[in-house]
Amino acid sequence: MKTPKMNVESFNLDHTKVKAPYVRVADRKKGVNGDVIVKYDVRFKQPNQDHMDMPSLHSLEHLVAEIIRNHANYVVDWSPMGCQTGFYLTVLNHDNYTEVLEVLEKTMQDVLKATEVPASNEKQCGWAANHTLEGAKNLARAFLDKRAEWSEVGV
């Protein structure tokens, strides 16, 4: 039986046919004034086989959200997937996949040098007790170790 087409792009992705880690264009929208929004699926873990623990994911979210903007002024958002296997990177008016990979690489290298998780306090975070710098670094290191595979989605 054929699965009906869904409104959410990732629900139409056959998660059994991908090979994490990878970075793929998940969506591209053009606004009425010509602006282009590109959403990337930045997958760290193999769907339905592994996932990121919440404190590590949460800390990597904070670190990347802060650090990536040092490398790219076109970043709109870096947000975690509910399935805990990756993140979505949303950019504005920048449609160069190779440059996005380079920015992600530089950002992950900077994560490895971090001495603290930014905004991991009760004033700036909704779950401040749920962080681990070492866990975030482990995720970044494992992702970087497979840098040569990021463009190989497997679909």
UniProtKB/Swiss-Prot annotation:
Its cofactor is Fe cation. Coiled coil: none annotated. It catalyses: S-(5-deoxy-D-ribos-5-yl)-L-homocysteine = (S)-4,5-dihydroxypentane-2,3-dione + L-homocysteine. Fe cation binds at H58, H62, C125. The keyword Iron applies. GO terms for biological process: quorum sensing. Signal peptide: none annotated. Its EC number is 4.4.1.21. Binds 1 Fe cation per subunit. Keywords: Autoinducer synthesis, Iron, Lyase, Metal-binding, Quorum sensing. It holds the Pfam family LuxS. GO terms for molecular function: iron ion binding; S-ribosylhomocysteine lyase activity. Involved in the synthesis of autoinducer 2 (AI-2) which is secreted by bacteria and is used to communicate both the cell density and the metabolic potential of the environment. The regulation of gene expression in response to changes in cell density is called quorum sensing. Catalyzes the transformation of S-ribosylhomocysteine (RHC) to homocysteine (HC) and 4,5-dihydroxy-2,3-pentadione (DPD). Belongs to the LuxS family. Homodimer. This is S-ribosylhomocysteine lyase. It comes from Helicobacter pylori (strain P12). The gene is luxS.
